[in-house]
Design a protein with these regions (language model features):
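Phosphate-coordinating catalytic segments in nucleotide- and nucleic-acid-processing enzymes
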Residues: 51-272, 278, 341-377
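Switch/communication elements of ASCE P-loop NTPase nucleotide-binding domains
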Residues: 1-55, 251-376
């Protein structure tokens, strides 16, 4: 079983405060009430992908705004949304912090600083995209000489190594053109609830014939006539088209199929990209009918074990939770290592603190069968 992240403590990240999960597993089902922090939990894990790269932090901050074609907030505003509001701190103070144990090493991530008003020199003024939609009305005929900015330090400690980087990011800064270090601590892949609508899921699947055959078998749950996955070029545009070969209909573009097939292919591609790393699946049940849960989840568990992938999965659906628990025959595996943990998140709104209850899959399965245990609360 792949367990690359052994434990996690989120000191502060978005709406999560003082959340401790002392033991993580190969398959981690993250559940809880609305607004308890399930998606934020996955985003915090993404900080461990490349903790010393501030661009990685900005990329995480921008993820929720990625589908907004118009009217999205600025990169600076996105960054500020990562910091939880704390009435006990000075109004300008900001801090993100988490600790984890990854592959036997202790890891610390801490971004701490203040929001303040700064002067913009002539060089920085000239770099402001004054004709962008967001800034056009604001600037009109004048260029701002001052603005709001976050100034602080990013501290990262991995084992005995420590790195401290000075950070300065103001309200007219952009993400475009920033350096990407690619010093990945962990290979972490995140799948948003609607990533399957973006396309681009074939490339990793097609390079591995045995894995492609396994994916085709899963797709046959939806349509028994599917026999192959192909990538063809459009004769007019020369652009690649993701296609499905059908024994009766011939070659069909993937776009002609429903969201369920696209969702399964998105997950399959995510597993292939997360080899020897971590896969984060947000709202796994999206676009999948409950009658397919057990077969698809069995595929996820099998493929993740094969490729050495630790997986974290959020869900609102009790049927999805039961579907995952059903892939293990707990009546016959008594005493064996349980690959599944169910992590229930809960937020105390009076203290703003977050809590986690971690139960084994076997414990939840038995209590679901005997008492109808509601694990999501």
């Amino acid at each position: 079983m792949a367990i690359h992240i052994e434990n996690l403590k989120i000191e502060q990240f978005r709406g999560i405060r003082q959340l401790s999960v002392p033991h993580l597993n190969h398959i981690n089902l993250i559940v809880g009430d609305n607004n308890c922090g399930k998606t934020s939990f996955l985003e915090a894990l993404l900080l461990l992908r490349d903790p010393g790269d501030f661009t990685n932090t900005l990329r995480i901050a921008r993820m929720r705004d990625s589908l907004a074609m118009y009217g999205g907030i600025s990169a600076y505003e996105s960054l500020l949304t990562l910091f939880p509001h704390n009435s006990n701190e000075a109004e300008t103070a900001r801090m993100l912090s988490l600790q984890a144990r990854c592959r036997g090493e202790d890891v610390l991530y801490s971004l701490e600083g203040n929001v303040k008003t700064i002067m913009l020199d002539a060089e920085e003024q000239n770099r402001i995209p004054r004709y962008s939609i967001r800034n056009f009305r604001k600037f009109k005929d004048s260029i701002p000489s001052e603005c709001q900015a976050f100034q602080g330090n990013l501290l990262v400690r991995t084992g005995n190594n420590q790195e401290k980087t000075e950070i300065r990011f103001h309200e007219y800064s952009t993400v475009s053109g920033r350096d990407i270090t690619n010093r990945h601590l962990l290979n972490i892949v995140y799948l948003a609830p609607f990533d399957h609508l973006r396309g681009g899921n074939f490339s990793r699947i097609l390079t591995n014939d045995p894995y492609k055959e396994l994916c085709v078998q899963i797709l046959q749950l939806f349509d028994p006539g599917i026999t192959d996955l192909l990538m063809l070029k459009n004769e007019n545009t020369n652009r690649p088209i993701e296609c499905v070969k059908h024994k009766e209909l011939g070659i069909m573009p993937l776009s002609s199929y429903g969201d369920g097939i696209k969702k399964v292919l998105s997950i399959a591609s995510g597993i292939a990209r997360a080899v020897d790393g971590v896969l984060l699946i947000d709202e796994v049940e999206t676009a999948i009918h409950s009658r397919y849960f057990e077969d698809i989840f069995r595929f996820i568990a099998s493929a993740c074990r094969k490729f050495g992938v630790q997986v974290f999965i959020t869900s609102h659906s009790i049927e999805a939770i039961d579907g995952f628990l059903s892939i293990v025959d707990y009546e016959k595996t008594t005493g064996q290592e349980d690959p599944i943990s169910v992590v229930t998140l809960k937020k105390d709104w009076s203290s703003s603190l977050s809590y986690a209850r971690v139960l084994s899959g076997c414990h939840v399965h038995q209590n679901r069968e005997q008492f109808g245990f509601e694990v999501r609360l």
